[in-house]
Design a protein with these regions (language model features):
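Amphipathic coiled-coil/heptad-repeat helices and related helical stalk/stem segments
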Residues: 44-48, 101, 282
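Flexible, active-site-adjacent loop/turn segments at secondary-structure boundaries
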Residues: 33-35, 69, 91, 99, ...
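Acidic catalytic cores of enzymes that act on phosphate-bearing nucleotides/polynucleotides
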Residues: 30-33, 51, 197-201, 211-286
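Glycine-rich phosphate-binding loops that contact phosphosugars or nucleotide phosphates
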Residues: 53-214
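Extended, charge-enriched "interface" segments that sit outside catalytic cores
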Residues: 1-53
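Short, flexible loop segments at the rims of nucleotide/cofactor-binding pockets, characterized by
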Residues: 38-44, 91-94, 215-217, 275-276
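Glycine-/proline-rich flexible loop or hinge segments
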Residues: 30-38, 58-62, 282
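Non-transmembrane, aqueous-exposed alpha-helical and coiled segments at domain scale
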Residues: 10, 142, 262-263
Length: 286
């Protein structure tokens, strides 16, 4: 389990209880779904296993996504590299770079590759463009798409509607889960399960963290958040991770902060600027 070490004097709980209370109210309201994904996503594991069961010919999986539909998956792929039960290889394209697309496609064979198109809204322009590019590259007819593609999106989104029309299977993201916080939904669970990563262990770990905070009332995370917020001297937030396995996690951190706290407040450009570094390499160059 995670070990928390604080290198500063803790604040009295009275000073931060209001923040904890707001989070608890939000959790209990049911309006924000990511608090419950460690439970609700267990069914996704079985659904994903059922989907891939008769597709033993699939050796490689290409996930097309942007932002919240890719960053978290990349991080978990790096973390769970030694927690795999099959040999399926997971590739991720999260940019419209022609170089990346070309180099990735060279490694894939249409006959043994499953393409996952992931967009919560179903209208992410970069994802839709890459989807069309894949169809054109492999010269696929509409009638062939259901054999090679699967969608991850909101129920009744335009992507889901297209999937229904073409016979392409769709996994759904809960409506009350925002895209940037969706890694424990179908966004992350489906590709991880299909490629044999230990998704059940991941959800169990998330559940343990949830219980530490909400059930056992451990306050280290709140203490850290409060300290960093009240002691900052600049609008720059630096994450220094020690280990190459954190590269994907660092990218995810930047995406989460930039898309949330990094945005300007009102008309004042005072949002945080996130910077992610890998030690000891980046420390050496400082």
């Amino acid at each position: 389990m995670l070990k928390h070490t604080l290198f500063f004097e803790k604040e009295k709980l009275n000073g931060i209880l209001a923040y904890a209370s707001r989070m608890n109210d939000e959790r209990q309201s049911g309006e924000v779904g990511y608090y419950h994904l460690m439970d609700t996503s267990l069914a996704l594991i079985k659904e994903s296993e059922k989907f891939i069961k008769d597709k033993e010919h699939i050796k490689k999986v290409l996930l097309i996504g942007m932002g919240g539909s890719s960053c978290g998956v990349k991080a978990l792929k790096d973390f769970l590299f030694d927690e795999k039960s099959n040999e399926r290889e997971l590739f991720i394209i999260d940019n419209t770079s022609s170089h990346t697309f070309t180099q990735t496609i060279k490694k894939l064979n249409l006959k043994d590759t499953l393409f996952i198109i992931s967009s919560k809204t179903g209208t992410t322009i970069e994802v839709v463009s890459l989807f069309k590019l894949l169809i054109a590259h492999f010269k696929l007819e509409n009638s062939e798409l259901k054999k090679h593609f699967v969608f991850i999106t909101d129920e009744n989104s335009k992507l889901h509607q297209l999937g229904d029309k073409l016979g392409i299977y769709s996994f759904f993201v809960p409506q009350n889960v925002g895209g940037r916080f969706s890694v424990l939904s179908a966004i992350g669970i489906v590709p991880l399960v299909i490629c044999g990563y230990n998704a059940k262990g991941l959800l169990e770990g998330a559940k343990a963290c949830y219980e530490d905070f909400f059930t056992h009332k451990k306050d280290e995370i709140l203490q850290k958040a409060y300290h960093y917020c009240t002691h900052k001297n600049a609008h720059i937030n630096v994450l220094f991770s020690y280990g190459d396995a954190f590269k994907g996690f660092n990218e995810w951190f930047v995406q989460l902060i930039a898309e949330s706290l990094g945005k300007k407040q009102g008309y004042k450009r005072v949002g945080l600027t996130p910077i992610a570094l890998i030690g000891a390499r980046d420390q050496h160059s400082c």
